[in-house]
């Protein structure tokens, strides 16, 4: 039944052959020969098959059991009844026969009696009649009468032949004959009787047949049971086996009978089954249970066990009947199904979860994209505003106007910074941030950053730069990004520090453990390969301050976007909360780590460690040599090995217009003069502080030194005072005047003072620019198809003091480049005839190959006569700046991929143009 | 006389501000104005004139292209609108620029109805702007003629 149900359930699955419950290859040889699991032939041949009984039973106790159990006894009673019934039937038949015979005999005897009577009458014997008795008299009379009547009827016959002998003879003969016949009949009856008796004997045959039938039925039963995958058994009250069917083959009779499960088997499930049986025995209710056995004997098998209590005639429990069916496969399948269903559910749940996540991610991406686009859209006009303000600041303004303008510029810068932050962040997050590997000097960078910070410093803070001696002069890395990080951290430090020091400390450290762990192998290989030319160095950079510090509980969320240590801080100090997030992301992008340690009201230290590639150490020593005899060197060597810079607060710091020299983000037009003893571009510093601080770093006007752009114009090496002579004396008195005025004034005063300064420095700048122009006027080519854009750009260029040539499309650009040499190309991306990207590719191809073959192939008409001219030209890389309406990551990627150096987003503003020219025109 | 100049100046300032506030112009126009100096006193007017000529030409181009019912060269329209977008962005014609962006989108999706509708709007918008700027330049001229200085307008 169970088996059937199971097969129904697994119908869709492959119906497999049910294997034998017990393994085939166990059991003793002796057991085996009786083990006729599957007799050959079909059921019809059952009679011929000798079915050995596999039953092991205690023969002495079985009858007892049978007698004492209900089933046994009732079965036996049935048999007996049936047998009795058959016997009765036979007996009844025989009795009837006997009755018949008896009757026949009685008849015969009656006849005989009659004959004898008749004979008596013939002999005429006197009858003894009691005389005295009246009744007898009466009886006699009656008899008389009767006899009379009888005699009377025969009297005549007798009378007739009475006299003759012949008659008597005849009479005797006939009597004799009758006797004979009678005897004969008797004999025949006797014969019949004996025959009857014989048949009686043969009546025992049905019993035998019955026995045979019984045997056959039993055989059939055995056959069925033998093939059935079940174990059956009977156990007594103590759960000792009295009987078992289909036992495990290797167990012998004596191993099982009289023993309990626990005694026979060992392992899991045995105890359970034993308990279950006992429970059934106690409760007296048949029940089923699935039990998994794990025994040494047959491993792990699951059995469906049915146990029922057995009662004797008196209604007392005497044991249990036990039936077990192996359902291991079914259980396994069922479990598999359950597992599958569970897996399915889990997968579905995960899928929906995933969908949700995807949805959220998409939403986030869209939001980010939106933010980036929006930021960009805001940035373009804003930079216009700021740029215009800057241009405005170069014109003649009264004090009030200038003050307003400065506020406008600084707030504009702030917003620009914020938008740049957002764009940077989305760039890093979307993975399109490209890192560049350029050689740079860490000392210069630190100095420059501090210098810039000092320029916008409005507090009495000392800025310090400290670079360990073992830091290489030159390393390779993405200097722009590193500068960005430093600037960010420094401006943070300054923001949260009211007095004391802020500084940067650089030192070489051994490879940090977080890298060593996961990149040990790769790195060593690299070292081996590049050992001669290039090695990696890890530089640890601390940006420390003596500021308000950060409470410990705020540290974890410090690097999260839009998070600041507390809302109070955000209100008090402003800021977007993006700076640190960007720093962290950038540092991680470059394979480093940014950490922070801080104590409240003692200060914070932000530390980032980054790997850099280093050139050969030869370079270093070369630089050293160069440095050693620097007497009449340019200003550069000063930076190369200088390990310590300090920017002390000069009471009433002087702001000056530094001109276009600084390419940094923050208020690039301002530079603070802080070096105590130096004259910079003729500005005099506090002469009282004139102790020889040769270690001190001096601030030059607007970082010209770094850019080394206008060396020729002023050539101000701070070490040699004679260079200040360069016609700056005229400012002397004015500057000292403003110094003193600013000393006495607050911030507002500083603004006022600036106007004068600006005028002078502006004049100076113009002068410098004319000088530059005279020496080498840069040639700029604008490739743009939109007349209005051309007009605007041209006008801006004019403002910046440049003129430029115009090409209306890529082909014209190529022709122009072919015929004349340019220092910079501003290239629109989207143009008719030949777009900016393709044109750039062709120009780059020309630079590489020295011919315009690629362009000619592309269908650009280049006159051959000019080719010769071309070949003479130096094949320096021509800076090509893209002008694009869309600065989103992909577009800029495309620009870079096509060989462009940078890009300006449209609409072009004065500020953008100026930055670009600063970067690419030397 | 001074009162007239002051009046004109105030009028000019208000009018300029209204143009910004109503979204006709954006900061790029301010940028243009900064580029105007002694060397090129009519710079803005020149650029703007060029722009309106450009507008006229491009719009008629697009109108012609969109007139070819059933056989509209959306690529042609697209390149024209790209040009117009660049120009309007450069002069700070904010509304025209915004419409150009929408028109470009319609064009990219080949939405004929949208294109036609947008183009009509662009036409209206640029003409309005032209009229307004004309007014503004007239005011400027009046100020100059009255001997006044064109005031700086902070937006």
From Swiss-Prot, chain A:
CDD domains: HATPase_EvgS-ArcB-TorS-like (cd16922), HisKA (cd00082), REC_hyHK_CKI1_RcsC-like (cd17546). It is found in: Cell membrane; Cytoplasm. Disruption phenotype: Hypersensitive to abscisic acid (ABA) and ethylene (ACC) in roots. Reduced stomatal closure in response to H(2)O(2), bacterial pathogen associated molecular pattern (PAMP) flagellin, Pseudomonas syringae, darkness, nitric oxide and ethylene, but normal closure in response to ABA and the peptide elf. Increased sensitivity to pathogens and increased tolerance to high salinity. It catalyses: ATP + protein L-histidine = ADP + protein N-phospho-L-histidine. The modification Phosphohistidine is found at residue 376. Signal peptide: none annotated. Induction: By H(2)O(2). Residues 620-639, 728-773 are annotated as: Disordered. It is a peripheral membrane protein. Transmembrane segments: none annotated. Residues 373-614 form the Histidine kinase domain. Disulfide bonds: none annotated. Residues 738-747 have a biased composition (Low complexity). Residues 86-120, 169-205 form a coiled coil. Present in light-grown but not in etiolated seedlings. Mostly expressed in roots flowers and siliques, and, to a lower extent, in stems and leaves, especially in guard cells. GO terms for cellular component: cytoplasm; plant-type vacuole; plasma membrane. It is an enzyme of class 2 (transferase). Functions as a histidine kinase and transmits the stress signal to a downstream MAPK cascade. This protein undergoes an ATP-dependent autophosphorylation at a conserved histidine residue in the kinase core, and a phosphoryl group is then transferred to a conserved aspartate residue in the receiver domain. Negative regulator of the ETR1-dependent abscisic acid (ABA) and ethylene signaling pathway that inhibits the root elongation. Promotes stomatal closure. Interacts with AHP1, APH2, APH3, APH5 and APH6, but not with APH4. This is Histidine kinase 5. It comes from Arabidopsis thaliana. The gene is AHK5.
